[in-house]
Regions:
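P-loop NTP-binding core
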Residues: 1-252
Length: 252
């Protein structure tokens, strides 16, 4: 049975989707069977793996709201499988609000396919509302991207409070799978200080690999290609491949 890992941080612009996309591609290249479930209405993870949002037959919205089997919505790509998102998902919170077990809809959708994958990443929206709560209830662990910049730790206390609440009341198996340091600038002492602070806050949970600031990471999504393929030797690509090695080792 594979693991479900929610990639979550309620702050935007921390490298959440970039991490989800590139770790999916890098782990797939290592021979793992990986699914990226795009649970963000912006659907950037969907397009980041080369899936044309205009041409998908079903999305995660149809799976969670209309009970379409997840298998019917999954799109296979050269970089891993994708359970695509769409703008319709933005209205899912309103549609689910009066539903029984509204926080369990994603869990119900993913359970039938969980055993077919080594790893399922869930790319969460940058907020702590019902969609993210669904992801936390469905997951075995969370991966938290934290940018090595000012205010990096701001808001993480809210995330940790939510994590503790979900673990206590809804999903006792939920753990911190790992913390990924992103947007690291080795030219500044500040990035190093933030990295040290994050490691102090999450002892034993922070990946050794840090993801540097890298122009190729910003360019790759516009081509619908993971940076691990777009520019295999770039610093961003090398970092995500090394982080994928760390994740694979944790799964064994």
């Amino acid at each position: 049975m594979g693991k479900i890992i929610a990639v979550v941080n309620q702050k935007g612009g921390v490298g959440k989707t970039t991490s989800a996309v590139n770790l999916t591609a890098a782990l797939s290249a290592l021979g793992l069977k990986v699914l990226l479930c795009d649970f963000d209405p912006q659907a950037n993870a969907t397009s980041g793996l080369g899936v044309d949002k205009r041409k998908i037959k079903h999305s995660i919205y149809d799976v969670t709201i209309n009970d379409i089997p997840a298998e019917e919505a999954i799109v296979s790509t050269k970089y891993g499988d994708v359970l695509p998102s769409s703008a319709d998902l933005a209205g899912a919170t309103v549609e689910l609000i009066n539903s029984q077990h509204r926080e369990r809809q994603l869990e119900k959708a993913l359970q039938p396919i969980k055993g077919k994958y080594d790893l399922i990443f869930v790319d969460c929206p940058p907020s702590l509302e019902l969609l993210t709560l669904n992801a936390l209830c469905a997951s075995d662990g969370i991966l938290i991207p934290v940018q090595c910049e000012y205010y990096a730790l701001e808001g993480l206390s809210d995330l940790m409070n939510t994590l503790r609440m979900v673990k206590r009341k809804m999903n006792p198996r939920l753990e911190i799978f790992g913390v990924a340091l992103t947007m690291f600038d080795g030219r500044t002492n500040f990035s190093t200080q933030v990295a040290q602070e994050v490691r102090k806050h999450f002892p034993g949970k922070v990946f050794t690999t840090v993801v540097p600031r890298n122009i190729r990471l910003a360019e790759a999504p516009s081509h619908g290609i993971p940076v691990t393929v777009y520019d295999r030797t770039s610093r961003g690509s090398v970092a995500y491949k090394q982080m994928a090695d760390e994740i694979k080792a944790k799964l064994i």
